[in-house]
Amino acid sequence: MATECGKEIHTYFEDARGYELENVITYYHGEDSFEMKNIFTNKAEEKVSLEMLSSFEMGDISPFLEGIGTDALLVHRLRSKWSHEGRLVTETVEDLQLEPSWSNWSVGVERFGQRGSMPVMKYFPFVAVEDSVNHIVWGVQLAHEASWQMEVYRQDDGLHITGGLADREFGHWMKEIQPGESFETPKAILSVCQGDVDLMCHRLVSAGEKYMENVPESEQSLPIVFNEYCTTWGNPSDENISEILEAIKGKGFEYFVIDCGWFKEDGVPWDVSMGDYNVSPSLFPQGLEKTVERIREKGMKPGIWFEIDNVGPRARAFENTDHLLKRDGMPLSTYTRRFWDMTDPWVQDYLGEKVIGTLQKYGFE
C-alpha cells in the first residue's frame, strides 16, 4: 500500500493455535534499501512464551550461480573492539563450513552477535554476502541497541541470512505474550546491489539519514567538540582548562567537554573513584560555576563526562552493595569496577541527582 513517505507491504500469517504474525516491509521514496520487521500477536486464550522472533530473512543466495557456487560466495562482517573499530573481515562460505552436506539433511549455521547493552561488541550488527562472480551483494544491518544475533545458514544450494533479537539459546531472551497482546521486533535495513561491499555499506548507512531530521537543532550541523582528556589525562582543573581555552579560542569548536577526573579526591586516581561525583575543591576551588563561565566567555558550550553505570573501588558508592548488581548473591565485581542496579528506584533517584542535577545546576549542554 502507498504511504506518504513510500510504500508498505503487509503479509499476514496465522495458525490453528491462535498465533498471528504480520511481516511489514517498508520502502521510502528515493532510497536504495528497505526496512523489515515482524509483529507477533497472541490470539490464543493462554499466554505464550516466545524464545525467538527474527526481524528479517533473505534467502536462496545466489540465484545467479549454478549449484552451490563453490568459492564464489563471500561473507563480509565488521569486527570491533575498543579503539580498534570497524575492521572488515571477508571469508568464503567454505571457510565458514557452510557447504551443504551430501544428504542435505542437516543445516549449517554461522551465528554471531552480542549479548548486553553494547550494540557493537566484537561484531557490528551487519552482514553482507557477495556473489563474486556476478558482483551482486546482499546486505543487512539491525536497528537495535541491545542483544542481537545474525545467522548465515544453509541446508541445500541456497544460502540464507536471518537475524534480529538474540534468542533464548544465544542471548537468554524470552518474552511472555498475554492473550490479546502483541510484540514487535526491531527493524532491519536490507538492500541488494550490483557492485561491491563499499557500495552496500553506503546504501545501508544512507538509510539512517532521514532519522537525522529529528535530532536536536544543535546537532543538525554536526558541531565540533573539544574534549580535554588527551590534554590533562584525567586531571582537569580550573587552571589548566583556562589555559586550554585560551589556546583553542576562535578555532571553530562549538563545545568544550570537561572529561574524567573533575570529581577525584586528593591522591586518588580518577579511574578508581568514579561513582560519588562530588566536584573536587582542590581542582576547582571556585566550583564548576567559574569554569563553566570561562567556557562560555570563549564562545563555547560546556559539556561534562560521566560514566554513570559503574563505580570505582575508592568511591564510597563501591560499598553501597544494597544497590549494586549481584551475581549469586555477591556484588558483581571486575578488576576496578562494580555496577549500579539500574532497575533499583534508589539508584535512579541517586543518578538523577548526581547526573541530571549536575547538568541542570551548571547549565551543561
Task: Annotate each predicted stretch with a short phrase.
Residues 27, 50, 263-318:
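Acidic/aromatic-lined carbohydrate-recognition and catalytic surfaces
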Residues 221-223, 230-236, 303, 308-362:
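Active-site-adjacent "subsite" loops/lids of carbohydrate-active enzymes
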Residues 38, 180, 226, 256, ...:
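Conserved, mostly hydrophobic/aromatic
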Residues 1-156, 171:
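Polysaccharide-binding surfaces and accessory modules of carbohydrate-active proteins
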Residues 175-194:
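Short Pro-Gly-centered flexible turn/kink motifs
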Residues 159-171:
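Short, structured beta-strand/loop micro-motifs enriched in basic residues and often containing a Trp
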Residues 251-264, 351-365:
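Active-site groove signature of glycoside hydrolases
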Residues 203-255, 259, 264:
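An acidic-aromatic substrate-binding cleft motif
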